[in-house]
Amino acid sequence: MIIQRTGAGTQGAVNAVNATHLLLCSLTNAHATALYARKLAESAEGLVTLLPTAAFEDSYQDEDDVCADYLEALLQERDDAAEVLAGGIAYLHAIERFQWFEPDTSDAPLADVAAILATDCFNFAMVGTRKQWRDITYVDVEKRYL
């Protein structure tokens, strides 16, 4: 059995209990997620709520916020979506967001930075379904290709 737990993402998905549809997103599938969410919103006349899940006490923005800003620009079909993304990534570098990542550490390997910032690599949305197993609530995720 493998249990994946991130500090924020999986907890945010489980705690979004009032969501009619649950989509999980990172920069790697932001464009596909925006397209999928827009179709859902149009067909159901629904509202799209973005929930960047990481929270830091000093309230600086992190990659979750950058992803949410980029996703919002894509959802609104703004012409400056690429600039929003570039500005967010520049901000992350300016605040030295990845300064603790090191080449030979398993907790925060330097190689992960490229993966964190990789954008629009996949053409699928990740659709979550809330499930229960005994006393454990979790989100089962399925790829939906566009």
Could you say what each language-model-derived stretch is?
Residues 1, 7, 16, 20-21, ...:
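Long, charged alpha-helical interface segments
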Residues 1-58:
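Internal, conserved structured core segments that host functional sites
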